[in-house]
Amino acid sequence: MGKNKLLHPSLVLLLLVLLPTDASVSGKPQYMVLVPSLLHTEAAEKGCVLLSYLNETVTVSASLESVRGNRSLFTDLEAENDVLHCVAFAIPKSSSNEEVMFLTVQVKGPTQEFKKRTTVMVKNEDSLVFVQTDKSIYKPAQTVKFRVVSMDENFHPLNELIPLVYIQDPKGNRIAQWQSFQLEGGLKQFSFPLSSEPFQGSYKVVVQKKSGRRTEHPFTVEEFVLPKFEVQVTVPKIITILEEEMNVSVCGLYTYGKPVPGHVTVSICRKYSDASNCHGEDSQAFCEKFSGQLNSHGCFYQQVKTKVFQLKRKEYEMKLHTKAQIQEEGTVVELTGRQSSEITRTITKLSFVKADSHFRQGIPFFGQVRLVDGKGVPIPNKVIFIRGNEANYYSNATTDEHGLVQFSINTTNVMGTSLTVRVKYKDRSPCYGYQWVSEEHEEAHHTAYLVFSPSKSFVHLEPVSHELPCGQTQTVQAHYILNGGALQGLKKLSFYYLIMAKGGIVRTGTHGLLVKQEDMKGHFSISIPVKSDIAPVARLLIYAVLPTGDVIGDSAKYDVENCLANKVDLSFSPSQSLPALHAHLRVTAAPQSLCALRAVDQSVLLMKPDAELSASSVYNLLPEKDLTGFPGPLNDQGDEDCINRHNVYINGITYTPVSSTNEKDMYSFLEDMGLKAFTNSKIRKPKLCPQLQQYEMHGPEGLRVGFYESDVMGRGHARLVHAEEPPTETVRKYFPETWIWDLVVVNSSGVAEVGVTVPDTITEWKAGAFCLSEDAGLGISSTASLRAFQPFFVELTMPYSVIRGEVFTLKATVLNYLPKCIRVSVQLEASPAFLAVPVEKEQAPHCICANGRQTVSWAITPKSLGNVNFTVSAEALESQELCGTEVASVPEYGKKDTVIKPLLVEPEGLEKETTFNSLLCPSGGEVSEELSLKLPPNVVEESARASVSVLGDILGSAMQNTQNLLQMPYGCGEQNMVLFAPNIYVLDYLNETQQLTPEIKSKAIGYLNTGYQRQLNYKHYDGSYSTFGERYGRNQGNTWLTAFVLKTFAQARAYIFIDEAHITQALIWLSQRQKDNGCFRSSGSLLNNAIKGGVEDEVTLSAYITIALLEIPLTVTHPVVRNALFCLESAWKTAQEGDHGSHVYTKALLAYAFALAGNQDKRKEVLQSLHEEAVKKDNSVHWERPQKPKAPVGHFYEPQAPSAEVEMTSYALLAYLTAQPAPTSEDLTSATNIVKWITKQQNAQGGFSSTQDTVVALHALSKYGAATFTRTGKAAQVTIQSSGTFSNKFQVDNNNRLLLQQVSLPELPGEYSMKVTGEGCVYLQTSLKYNILPEKEEFPFALGVQTLPQTCDEPKAHTSFQISLSVSYTGSRSASNMAIVDVKMVSGFIPLKPTVKMLERSNHVSRTEVSNNHVLIYLDKVSNQTLSLFFTVLQDVPVRDLKPAIVKVYDYYETDEFAIAEYNAPCSKDLGNA
């Protein structure tokens, strides 16, 4: 049976009839069991059984065999004779995701037995998972909201356990993750805040399923401004080389649907082909440019001659690129739209719309062709020529109004195994030459192959060319020819049909046909209701079993609309609304559906269109949309004997067998369906025995199998294939990008009404919903729109900030989109905070007609400081006066619009801040402290303000300000850590003292997440970190910063997700920098010179890294730690033996390192040495550097201690507190004295002067707070009293010890006393702020500022000028640490960002930032060599009587070292008149 299975590929078989005489026994029992070749575990699978011509009862059984054992699918199934019976079965989950198994089917009866075994593919059923984000694009610091949804293959919700979801940034870093969560109702919602400085680019949400398979969903993070309007460019999609003109239209539409007034510039270009090697003038693009004004509809139209593009010329792209730029009238806003047109040489094209893939001799071959032009437009009334040589068919026909021609070919006389039909309209035109493109008239041809049937009986399904629409019934015609001799006395022949979809059998049916004992020909119809169960591709199989044992059949494929059973509808009521009104969102779906809603501003979709959730995108999740063919391992070679190559004589007719691989038999129809057949019926055409000796030159013996597999693979390889009264006035201030992101459950009637408040944005909101139901599955709504609109509204234009006394112009622009003219009064509400003078003398109401706008202006002189609100109202008035030729109308609703916008008014001069801190512990008695608040003589009037804060916890102030600990920028990798690390110490402290609340925890974890993201910006490919990261050209990792990040990331793991790869990579990088003596080599620059101690650099750095490793924590036996401790012990021994000792900073680090390592002896030795060098003053202890810089002269108050001294004192404090097993009472006494000094150095936010001192000091204070924490039942009373009339009392107890209690101090200057009674300790902090006018004094920096031009003579000086800076260091050191140049903008001007960014090309500029009205320039250091810096500023809003702006340069780590200078705009006195 197994011999002669290979046919040689060069053989061609034409078999007219092949019917072995011993197979024609009348009424022989026939069995057929059909099972899909691909089965899924844990899914409802189905197999179908047909028993024919049986006179006894039989049972059918099926079992699966694998290497892990056998499993029965069904046993002893009794099936009726001549009834197609389908049985459902399920396969348990396998340990292998995909496996080939043996399927055995056995039919058994008293006299009959049939058994067959074949292979099937078994795959584990996997859920369908998708992710939906609220938007496709986000700005830095926005929150990403997303949903994870899981369904089965029928789109019903699955409440599965998802092992892992994470977010990955553009560099592949995993920045957030969620583990092991259960879906509810088939979904779960998440949110994640982006940092203020994330990597920009493509991110993705990754869902990892239990199967290990992953689903990914991309989104983009960019800095962007939402477009106000859309530029719509309309050009022909296709133009032919014969066209002489093309029409172009450009329209500008605001997101609220109104036309844009403005000017348009259009360019159309045909570019030179990239593939050509020609350059120079000949390779220039052919372009046409034109411009014009947009009309009243916001559109511009132009007819363009195509001659300029030389459409017939080669070497140029066969495409025209159209670019249109619209500049909005009255603003500098310019947006661009693009479209392209394909150039085609095809003038006409013929294509088969409907044609059979195979033909049956005697049944007409049906076909339909369409004639279209080069643009795809049907051409009617044209004669086309049809030819079918094998059938001697030659015809012509005229196309109908749709360009269609239908034809049928009589196949009775076709003697070959193929039929080729060729269709032609015109012959190809003569060639123009090698430089020119010739026109083309495309012909069409189609080849159909013979269907094999030994009985000469056939059934044929008529093709359907269109997609089957949901909710309708499709009728399919079945044509048949029956050979009377093959019926053998049969009176009724049953045709059985089944439909497969999504890889499984979904429907079956039977059609009975009364037959006569003669040849029969006819047709009947099959009705198919189109529902979601047969989408997206339905395959229909029809077959009949003849008494001879022959099976006749056909299969057809139908594309089905992507139907979803859950019909979801979404609508807004009303569909247009004024801002801030209530509206209703109505959702209808299957009862009890869980519906996920989303509504976003259309501007977001214009910025980056969404990959919208749709029925099509959901169907694309299916692993098998259409099962066809068999995967390679499942190919059945058949077990029939081959026949020899000689003539066969049957019934007086001679047949010559010839091999043909394209000839169709019943087996191939089943294969098309992806069905395995277990049968004793004849379903295969006979195989011809090979004659290899005659064909050796044609190829290897096994080529037949190879061809078969590739053919199957090519065909699919199991292919995946009630409304309120609106107000008369609106006040607008809420402008979100995502408006609605909610989950709702519809009621038992299938309806949910959601009340919403329309945001203040004047735009169109686009909403969508998807719903999940246990019964009906998934449904997706079409987009619903709500237009938030006002008949008219007012917009304000003002600068970000001004200085008190400056005059600026406040502009209010009123826009009217009513169909009629209105008379509008525009009023600015008076306020004592400013003086307003109308620019126009006449303040009478303004007449604004349809689609018009009017601007009203005031000259404003601010009088008060701080945020000053400007309230402008525009009201439509009732009036009988004419507006033009008509009486002004008044809108029924929204006749008054009010906009409130704040403006920051700043005092003149330079702001100074002084903080006074006290830790008062009454211990049952009373303690008091006097406070004298004085002001310097050069203080700016009214600029002084002071407040006192009362907290019951030493870390209270820092807890309130964890993201604002320093009043300085956070633009580098080290500075970012001050936003990150303190949150860990706060959480540890509150956890240990049992004070952690969910609110504080949530807030701190949020900060940790954003800090983590931001820090990854500074990571290098090798796992190290540097101050500005690789993107700022710093190619070398920084040893010190890498150790800092490593220990902090390791400590943060207790609270947030940190990718272990970051920790491992950093640790490896650091270990590679360890020398043989255990010390570490320095890599990268240290921006703080204070920790550079000459020869001790290596010891200091090694001590710092050892501390970091022990804080991870690594054990002292870890090889890297063990060697590092050897380095430190050796260094301490050398220092003890030497004359000069060790730097105080290094000693403090050594003391803490030995404490962490548990080396108490060494800890005591170093602390004793430190104690001898300590500065003891006012019951406090601290340490100073030996070469401490002199404090600047002329300070009104004593400045904060330098960063390095706070840092080394904090390390000493940590060493006292890290005694093992616990600090002694002597340690705590020493620690308390240190804490008194450290707390005195805190700034108003709870931080210190710079980055490292803040991080280390807060770490030390948190350890001290935890070591000394006591929970007392008694309260402390705090009284703050002035020498005048002011008095205020606070109470601090266990319930409010973390509460920041604050009061302003009204008397300045003034004398105050602060008294505390009761129990516990109270932390008091007084903050005094004032402005002073800069005076000439000696600074450690030389700072010069000039403007170019310097005078107002040049015409552009009113609107633009350059700021030129010169900076050098003149202090006591050779160079400064990292320095910041802070340039404040003069009022009404903004920096030109590209010119600021250009500064980063300088070797000395590490980074630049534009923050509100300041430009920040980071310098890695400043020496005595002068640095020159330039950038440009532009006028944003005219301001008169401009005050000078301040430029300040300061050392980031020695903040007392600074210099200030002033500059003014060249036209500072008359800018308001510009």
Curated annotation (Swiss-Prot):
Organism superkingdom: Eukaryota
Region called Bait region, residue ranges: 690-728
Pfam family membership, one: MG3
Entry keywords, A to Z: Bait region, Disulfide bond, Glycoprotein, Isopeptide bond, Protease inhibitor, Secreted, Serine protease inhibitor, Signal, Thioester bond
GO CC terms in record: extracellular space
Gene3D superfamilies associated with the record: 1.50.10.20, 2.20.130.20, 2.60.120.1540, 2.60.40.1930, 2.60.40.1940, Alpha-macroglobulin, receptor-binding domain, Immunoglobulins
Localization annotation: Secreted
Location, primary (coarse class): secreted
PROSITE patterns: ALPHA_2_MACROGLOBULIN (PS00477)
InterPro entries: A-macroglobulin_rcpt-bd, A-macroglobulin_rcpt-bd_sf, A2M/Complement_sys, A2M_N_BRD, A2M_TED, Alpha-macroglob_thiol-ester_cl, Alpha-macroglobulin_TED, Ig-like_fold
GO-annotated molecular function: protease binding; serine-type endopeptidase inhibitor activity
Tissue-by-tissue expression: Plasma.
Cross-link (Isoglutamyl lysine isopeptide (Gln-Lys) (interchain with K-? in other proteins)): Q693, Q694
Cross-link type Isoglutamyl cysteine thioester (Cys-Gln), residue numbers: C972-Q975
SUPFAM superfamilies: Alpha-macroglobulin receptor domain, E set domains, Terpenoid cyclases/Protein prenyltransferases
Disulfide-linked positions: C48-C86, C251-C299, C269-C287, C470-C563, C595-C771, C642-C689, C821-C849, C847-C883, C921-C1321, C1079-C1127, C1352-C1467
Positions bearing carbohydrate: N55, N70, N247, N396, N410, N869, N991, N1424
Signal peptide coordinates: 1-23
Task of the protein: Is able to inhibit all four classes of proteinases by a unique 'trapping' mechanism. This protein has a peptide stretch, called the 'bait region' which contains specific cleavage sites for different proteinases. When a proteinase cleaves the bait region, a conformational change is induced in the protein which traps the proteinase. The entrapped enzyme remains active against low molecular weight substrates (activity against high molecular weight substrates is greatly reduced).
Assembly description: Homotetramer; disulfide-linked.
Name of this protein: Alpha-2-macroglobulin
Gene this protein is translated from: A2M
